[in-house]
């Protein structure tokens, strides 16, 4: 199956505004995000996303990646804590073997970048918003150097890119 990550980045490279990515989202980004979200066979999220985002309506497994061994308070019966104590690619592959369909990563910048570094993301759906954020900055050029842009469009000032991971990129 395919591991697909969604990421919205502000005009200044921030991935959050007031601690959340939703502040950077535009109608075009939100429509694409919801379409991908609703088609997921499973989710990989981080501990912070689990705490602030609502997955109440989800009917698929939700894997929460954390480095902590302390038991998290799980707010949904399909949430499973995954302690990241070994290679992220290996953990993601083990989850991939259990799931039929696409696994959608809805994580913050640090977890997403770690997954990209180990080749754990096949497709990146990147939205570049005209809104400036205030936290969790990334280097967009460095991020995109690991992917081939397969499609790009612009809707009302939001650039929507679909990118495929390059297994043989110079930086991997």
Predicted features and spans:
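Enzymes that bind and transform nitrogen-containing heteroaromatic metabolites
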Residues: 1-172
């Amino acid at each position: 199956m395919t591991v697909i990550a969604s990421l919205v980045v502000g005009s200044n490279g921030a991935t959050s505004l007031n601690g959340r990515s939703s502040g950077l989202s535009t109608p075009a980004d939100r429509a694409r995000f919801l379409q991908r979200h609703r088609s997921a066979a499973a989710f990989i999220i981080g501990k912070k996303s689990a705490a602030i985002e609502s997955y109440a309506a989800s009917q698929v497994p939700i894997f929460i990646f954390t480095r902590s061994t302390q038991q998290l308070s799980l707010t949904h019966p399909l949430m499973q804590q995954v302690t990241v104590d070994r290679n992220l690619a290996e953990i993601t592959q083990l989850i991939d073997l259990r799931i039929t369909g696409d696994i959608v990563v809805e994580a913050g910048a640090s977890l997403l970048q770690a997954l990209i570094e180990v080749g754990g993301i096949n497709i990146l759906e990147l939205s570049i918003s005209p809104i400036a954020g205030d936290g969790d900055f990334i280097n967009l050029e460095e991020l995109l150097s690991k992917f081939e842009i397969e499609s790009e469009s612009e809707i009302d000032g939001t650039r929507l890119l679909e990118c495929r991971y390059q297994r043989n990129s110079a930086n991997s």
